[in-house]
Each structure stands twice: as structure tokens, then as C-alpha cells.
Amino acid sequence: MRLDDVLTRIDTDVPAALDRLMALLRIPSISTDPAFRGDCDRAADWLVADLQSMGFEAAKRPTPGHPMVVAHGGTGGPHLLFYGHYDVQPVDPLSLWHRDPFDPAIEDTPKGRVLRGRGTSDDKGQLMTFLEAFRAWKAVHGSFPCRLTVFLEGEEESGSPSLIPFLQANAAELRADIAIICDTGMHEDHIPAITTMLRGLLGEELTITGPDKDLHSGSYGGAAINPIRVLSRILAALHDAKGRIQVPGFYDDVDELPEAIRAQWQSLSFDNAKFLGDVGLSVPAGEQDRTPLEMLWSRPTAEVNGIWGGYTGDGFKTVLPSEAHAKISFRLVSRQNPDKIRASFRAWVESQLPPDCTATWKAHGNSPAGVMAIDNPAFDRARAALTDEWGQPAVYVGAGGSIPVARCFKDYLGMDALLIGFARDDDQIHSPNEKYDVESFHKGIRSWARVLERLAR
């Protein structure tokens, strides 16, 4: 297998690869909004056609929600499953975008050329890196280097409600020697990374109800309970002055970081002042006895993501509201059980309610943390391949976010997961003006060709 010929083909094909990516990016496959259901179908159809054009047996597979795309190609050698997701986040607030989020374009910036648009980095640009590596390999050699399965999801950004039932129903077809997930990032702009630790996630939507209707604050203010005041007091008590979460038992299943891992993380270059300064901050707000990387990668969190109630429109209305609402998310680590944390949090909130107030709940998300099996030989081989491409030693890192599919592959298919991606910290995923560096896209494709060559041996 001549790798150099594949790399040359990739270099030559970059303009066409960018055109293909932009065609996919123009499809507004927002999975959380039912108005875009047809667009999610179109994105899945586009990917099926692209995979078939390379010689894969590919199909759009129905679910109760958005379809999965499953493709198979190659024979012999190890069996590798590649995962990505074709759905994207909503684009609100649209007014903050510099251009139409679904009219992607290449822009010149002080740091180089970038592709701007929703889904460029999360995750269409990323999944197209491995598809383009497959395309180049097939064009040069006439076949794939080993047995490949491609598994593309359409509900990752909306909680993956169809994922587990689909894995259970299709376990025999999808089970491979290892799952490879391209939905992570670089450690620094030119230092590749393999993510070995992921935080879990659960979300809660809380409504506190007091009076049975909105009241006039002149007629009832001071005498009637105000749910916004109750909610604000409870949320303010969620953390102590040192940043520790006050829900009873919250830290019971949180393991201390092994010293070897802590030492490796401390050896990584990480400029905390720049990390915070890039978003207009200067002082860490988490647990004050932890290093910044520990806060981000190995410690649990509780964050209020939204709070509302009463009158929030233009002008002024002296209302005493009937209800107050909040959305709270928890990032989980180690052995924390999402169901246990949810029950503890609800009990803690309800224990603080005054008379005449009730709490109602809506659950969002429910995934435990994940720790990857770095003793799998594929990790060392992939690390060497990334080092060869980027000219910098690839590093093992944690991630503050959640990629539940990694844990699902282990729990339901018995597969370890290898997480490699080429996103950069300033890609603005989930935010207006999302971008993906053209260099990340180009070298990401080359990286996958090198990984394929090493894993297929």
C-alpha cells in the first residue's frame, strides 16, 4: 500500500473536496427543529449518494426520528467503524452571523483560510475528512485498505433519542474491531490530540409555580410569593463560595485523577490567561483548588443555561408571575450515575421550596462519563500516524464536553472508541460564525490516510 500516492492524490483534490463539503453544508439539517426534518432527509440522501459514488454499499436507515446512514466497503483485515453526525445546531441569533450560515464560503483571516458556515466544524467538515481519505485511497488503489463501516447519525445535536435502539437492533451489523469518532479537536492549532476522557451530561428544565395566575404587583406584591425570587435563591445556593456544588452526595462517585494523568496534563502547554482572555474573562470561576485542565476535563459541573419568567418583552409590566423557569445542565465524571444525580438534585430543590410553591420537571439528556481504553494497540498506532502528519507529538487529552456515542459503542457493541478530530478552540461551534480552518480540513484528510495505513497493517 503506497501511502505517498494517496497523500499526493489528497493534495491535488483539495479544491474538489472543499466543493463537496460546501454542497453538504448548504443543506440546513437542524435536527432539533421539526421544520427542518426534510432537510435532514436531504443531507442523509446526499451522503448516501456520495458514499455509493466511492463504491460503498450505502443506505439511509429509518428511525422514529431522523435517519441513520450506514455504509459498508472493503474486505479483509481489521474492521473499522467510522462515526460522525450530519445534523447541526440551530443558528440563533441569526443577527450575529456575518453571512448566511447555510451559504458557506472560504474567507481569508490573519490566521489563514477558513471555511465559514454552520456545520463546518461540528460535524460535517470533520466527517468529510475521513470520507475524503476513503475517496483518495479508493482512487489510487482501486479498493479500500481494510473492511470499513461508516455510521452517520442525524440526531446527535438533539440528544440522540434513536441511537441506542438502533445500536441494539443492528448490533451484529455494526460491531467492529474499533469505533473511530471524528467529533473532537486539536490540543493546539498544530498539535494533534486523541481524546481519552469525556464528561457525561444530564439536563433539567425546572418550573417553580406559586400563584395560580399572574398577579398585579401593586395589589399582591409583598404578600404573595414570587416564584422568580424563590428560583433565584435556589440557584444561587447551588454552589458555595469556592465553587463546590451543594447537592448532597454529588461528589460521592467522583474519583481523584491518577497522578500519572495529572502529571501528563500538567506537562501540556495550556495558557489559562489566554484561554479566559479569548472570551473576555480573567479569573477562573470553578473549584479553586483545581488546575484549569482538571476543571475542564475531570471535574463535574452544574451550570444554569437559561432562566426566565414574568414579563420580558419591550417596555415594562409590573407583574408578579405565576411561574419561573430555569434550564440547568450537569457535566458528570468518573462513576457518577446520571439517574442518581438527577434524583438528588430534584430532592435538593424540593427541600428548599417554601409553602405554596411546587416544582415540576422536564428531563433532557442522560449520559454517563466515558474513559477510553488507551491500552488498545490502535491508540499507539493512531498517535504515531498523527505525529507523522503534523510534525508534533500527538497528545492524549480529556474533553469537557460529552460524546455519548463513545460510551454507547462500548455498552451496546462491546467496542472501544478512538476519538480523533481536527477542530480548533476558536471554531465557534454552536455559536454564530462557526468556521473550520482549511488547513484542518486538508491535513485532517491526510491524517486519516496515515491512520488507515497503520491500522490496516
Residue positions per predicted region:
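N-terminal helical capping/dimerization or prosegment-like subdomains
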Residues: M1-L94, E323, K340
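Active-site metal-coordination/substrate-binding segment of hydrolases
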Residues: G77-T149, K443
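Acidic/histidine-rich catalytic neighborhood of metal-dependent amide-processing enzymes
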Residues: V114, G119-M197, A456
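Acidic-enriched catalytic cores of C-N bond-cleaving enzymes acting on peptides and small amides
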Residues: H187, T196, S217-I307, Q336-T358
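Zn-dependent metallopeptidase/amidohydrolase metal-coordination segment
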Residues: T207, L231, F316, L320-A324, ...
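C-terminal catalytic subdomain
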Residues: R233, G309, D314-S344
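A short beta-alpha structural unit
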Residues: F330-V333, T360-D375, A399-G400
